[in-house]
Structures are given as C-alpha cells and as structure tokens.
Amino acid sequence: MNPKTRSILKHLLLFTLTLLTTTLAGVEWQFSRFLFSSNPVTWEYFLKGFAFSIPLLGFLTVHEFGHYFAAKWHKVKVTLPFYIPLWLGFIGFPTIGTAGAVIRIKDLVESRRKYFDIGIAGPLAGFVVALGVLFYGFTHLPPPEYIFEIHPEYEEYGLDYADYVYEDNPLAFQVGTTLLFEFFKEYVAPQPERVPNPHEIIHFTWIFAC
C-alpha cells in the first residue's frame, strides 16, 4: 500500500471512529442512555443519535476544510483533517464524543497575510454552517410537551415543571446563552413556549450541537 493511500485510510478511520463516538454521545445527551448501563443504547436510539453527530461533524468538517482550502489557495501544503474521537460513555461520563479536529501545516508560511487567511477561513466557514443548523433547529422545535418523553417525572408538574424540578438539585446545570442564541429565540422560533429551558437544551440536538 502506497503512503498516500495509507494516509487517506488513516483519516477515514479517524472520521469513522469520531462519527461513532459522537453518535453515542448524542444518545447519551438526548436520552440519558449509555452503552453499558441498565438503560442501554438500542439500535433505535443509536440511529436517533445521528441528529447530534451529523450537525456537529458537519460544522467541524466545514471548519477544518475552511483552513484546508485556504491553505491550498495560498499553495501551502497541509494534511487532511485529523479527527479526534473522545468518548467516556463507557464509564457513564457524557462527552460530546470528540476533542475536535486539526490539520497540520507542512510548509513554512511565508507571510502574516497567509497565516491570517488560513486561520480565519475555518471559523468563517464553520459560522455559516452553524447559522444553517441553528435555523433548522429553531424552526423545527417540537411542542413543549416533548420534554415529558425525556423526563416523564416532570409531567406531574405540567409545563410549569421548571418552577419545581431544579430546586435543591446539585446535579442541575444549564447551557449558557449567546447573542446568536437570543436572536434565534426571539426572531426565528415559531412560538416562544417551544424554546427549550436552558437546563434541557442538551435534549435538543440541532441546537446543542452548535
């Protein structure tokens, strides 16, 4: 096997492993199901995990190829992205399934402008994808009762569950907000009551992935 083919296979293997680990992570965040637990990951739930891994890896891939194609434009030799799988679900500890991805520059970059172009291209490309993913996520929010499918124990409180279930709960945490999130919440979400509680965003993968 020639070195080029071996290198491509290595990148494909890392991507495949990262797709697997991020899909498992999606199941863990959405449904609190872990591979080795009393509430295991079935094939049905594994397929649902792609709702997390596809937007996350889509964002990550476009980000890295933004760097890659900018480098090619400037005739700077770089590698394909190295995806980094990171999954701790086997010990019951949720992660997003990856530590990201990197490309390696194999040439001396001769100017600050080239460095700047290569550096900025990734975030700009990824930001465009993030906008699309968030737009889809906010325009396809399920009814507020969806949370009872994940947390049936909330149902006794009705849609006012947030006033009760997080009190005196040391494990309760919430995802912080951003200006972009607030914009989509205010102007894109079809109905305010469909916007998930900050404690529950982890179950809404198209939003959580970005």
Sequence positions of predicted segments:
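Hydrophobic transmembrane alpha-helices and their immediate loop junctions
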Residues: 1-210
